[in-house]
């Protein structure tokens, strides 16, 4: 199936009571690809050829008929979710992650970083609560380069 345009976004209504949703699962880095050959989680062959330079987003609806729809979501990835108890722990966590140039997302009261075995001892040392789990990223990390 050739797909050349995005029809909408279903990020806020992932499940539909009348239509089956097939997912194209991508690494979040792949969201910027405009040409891609892949398949859905149900095995439907997909050729993606999009115009423009707007990146794909979690929930982008690529195809739909009366029985099913095909949309984008990111793959589950191993992450470390840090849950500081107060501003002191938040500050220590942010300082240490920033000092290492570790990209992070802040959602609700959590700091989320990609799993990295070198971060766990650091978090243990500063005494902040964290857990290693899996999540789907709904937005990309923002890398900010600089030089010393």
Swiss-Prot record:
The gene is ureE. GO terms for biological process: protein folding; protein-containing complex assembly; urea metabolic process. One of its GO terms (molecular function) is nickel cation binding. Belongs to the UreE family. Involved in urease metallocenter assembly. Binds nickel. Probably functions as a nickel donor during metallocenter assembly. HAMAP family: UreE. GO terms for cellular component: cytoplasm. Keywords: Chaperone, Cytoplasm, Nickel. SUPFAM superfamilies: Urease metallochaperone UreE, C-terminal domain, Urease metallochaperone UreE, N-terminal domain. InterPro entries: UreE (IPR012406), UreE_C_dom (IPR007864), UreE_N (IPR004029), UreE_N_sf (IPR036118). This is Urease accessory protein UreE. It is found in: Cytoplasm. It comes from Lysinibacillus sphaericus (strain C3-41).
């Amino acid at each position: 199936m050739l797909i050349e345009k995005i029809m909408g976004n279903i990020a806020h209504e992932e499940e539909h009571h009348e239509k089956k949703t097939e997912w194209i699962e991508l690494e979040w880095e792949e969201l910027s690809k405009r040409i891609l050959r892949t398949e859905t989680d149900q095995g439907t062959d997909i050729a993606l050829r999009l115009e423009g330079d707007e990146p794909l987003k979690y929930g982008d609806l690529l195809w739909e008929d009366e029985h099913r729809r095909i949309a984008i979501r990111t793959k589950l990835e191993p992450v470390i979710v840090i849950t500081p108890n107060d501003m002191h722990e938040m500050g220590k966590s942010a300082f240490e992650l920033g000092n290492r140039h570790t990209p992070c997302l802040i959602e609700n009261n959590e700091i989320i970083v990609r799993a990295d075995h070198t971060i766990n001892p650091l978090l243990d040392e500063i005494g902040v609560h964290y857990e290693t789990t899996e999540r789907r990223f709904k937005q990309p990390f923002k890398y900010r380069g600089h030089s010393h």
